[in-house]
């Protein structure tokens, strides 16, 4: 959803609901009351010692919808689609997207694609604030959930950082234990009454899509964004201990290239000289590989949550992605949109509707 060019990334992430004449065919009432969210409270970093952190004074009966999945699996698209059907607000749970800056590199959904739906904790933390930890997300995220519920809206927690999701929702959370990497037992007791939607697809299809998406991101300004990031503070590329936004995929890969071939501030991806382009293409290859490896790790953590007792409802988006990639440049986008609605959006809407009626 990051670019306006007609490529595979835009093709998949922009479903027909962006057309004002399109209406969902689902038998779910449209509720579009959108109160403005309150100003975000000032973030105060929390200690991350080994002590157990109890839950905030939340009500266990409060309902929260959680949309999970690997990077690039369509979580943001599903959240926007569902938010046009239910009175809701979206809480970002991607650990890189909480920071301001590098909007293309971190795949933030741009404001114009949010359709007026309130989004929280996206671009909210200044990168100079340092590391925004799972403990910080637990405290701030639960506060945002309380605010959303107080307005009579449904919180949607959306993102691929499963460590953030676990910290937010587990009844008792130990910041000193990396439960999702195998050390410790997954807590199946939750702070809220949760409905988990897991957007999944076959990994070969996701791998192909992610590699194409990286190309589209560079065609949409990712390189120029990284050059500007470099010139804003060249020292950040020299620091050994990375924190916060410096860990975003794309920054470390280009750091090595920029040390050897410092970019000119006027450089553009399309106008690079052959020497620099050859050097930078190696960084692009690394970005593609690291993105696919991240997706594998995210899927592994989701499966660990499932095996630990979390009731995850899996939505298979494989055929929708296949159709989207096949439709690139063919003008046949309606087919994959129909598949998405039949196999992902429709079942998800029914699950959420039943969840709210329970």
Segments (PLM) and residue ranges:
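Residue-level signal for inorganic ion chemistry
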Residues: 94, 122, 160, 221, ...
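Phosphate/Mg2+-binding loops and adjacent switch elements
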Residues: 147-224, 228
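Short, conserved catalytic or adaptor-binding loops enriched in Gly and charged residues
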Residues: 111-116, 185-191, 305-307
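N-terminal phosphate/diphosphate-binding loop that engages ATP/GTP or pyrophosphate donors
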Residues: 48-65, 76-156, 164-182
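Charged, alpha-helix-enriched surfaces in structured cytosolic catalytic cores
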Residues: 132, 136-139, 159, 163, ...
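Catalytic core of IPPT-family isopentenyl/dimethylallyl transferases
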Residues: 2-87, 192-358
């Amino acid at each position: 959803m990051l670019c306006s060019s007609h490529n595979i990334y835009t093709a998949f992430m922009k479903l027909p609901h962006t057309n004002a004449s399109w209406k969902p065919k689902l038998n779910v009432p449209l509720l579009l009351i959108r109160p403005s969210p309150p100003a975000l409270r000032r973030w105060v970093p929390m200690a991350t010692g080994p002590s157990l952190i109890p839950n905030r004074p939340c009500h266990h009966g409060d309902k929260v919808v959680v949309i999970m999945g690997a990077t690039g699996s369509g979580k943001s698209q599903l959240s926007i689609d569902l938010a046009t059907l239910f009175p809701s607000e979206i809480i970002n749970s991607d650990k890189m997207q909480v920071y301001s800056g590098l909007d293309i590199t971190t795949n933030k959904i741009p404001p114009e694609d949010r359709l007026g739906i309130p989004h929280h904790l996206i671009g909210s933390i200044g990168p100079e604030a340092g590391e925004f930890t799972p403990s910080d997300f637990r405290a701030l995220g639960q506060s945002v959930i309380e605010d959303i519920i107080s307005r009579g809206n449904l919180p949607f927690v959306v993102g691929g950082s499963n460590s953030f999701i676990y910290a937010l929702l587990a009844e008792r959370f130990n910041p000193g234990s990396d439960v999702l990497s195998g050390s410790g037992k997954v807590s199946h007791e939750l702070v809220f009454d949760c409905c988990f939607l897991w957007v999944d697809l076959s990994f070969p299809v996701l791998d192909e899509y992610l590699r194409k998406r990286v190309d589209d991101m560079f065609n949409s300004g990712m390189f120029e964004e990284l050059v500007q990031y470099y010139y804003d503070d060249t020292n950040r590329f020299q620091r050994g201990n990375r924190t916060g936004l410096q860990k975003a995929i794309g920054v470390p890969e280009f750091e090595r290239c920029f040390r050897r071939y410092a970019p000119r501030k006027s450089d553009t991806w399309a106008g690079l000289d052959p020497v620099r382009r050859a050097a930078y293409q190696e960084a692009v290859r690394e970005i593609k590989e690291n993105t696919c490896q991240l997706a594998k790790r995210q899927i592994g953590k989701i499966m660990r949550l499932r095996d630990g007792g979390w009731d995850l409802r899996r939505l298979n988006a494989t055929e929708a992605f296949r159709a989207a990639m096949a439709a690139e440049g063919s003008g046949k986008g309606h087919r994959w949109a129909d598949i998405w609605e039949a196999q992902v959006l429709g079942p998800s809407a029914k699950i959420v509707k039943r969840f709210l009626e329970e």
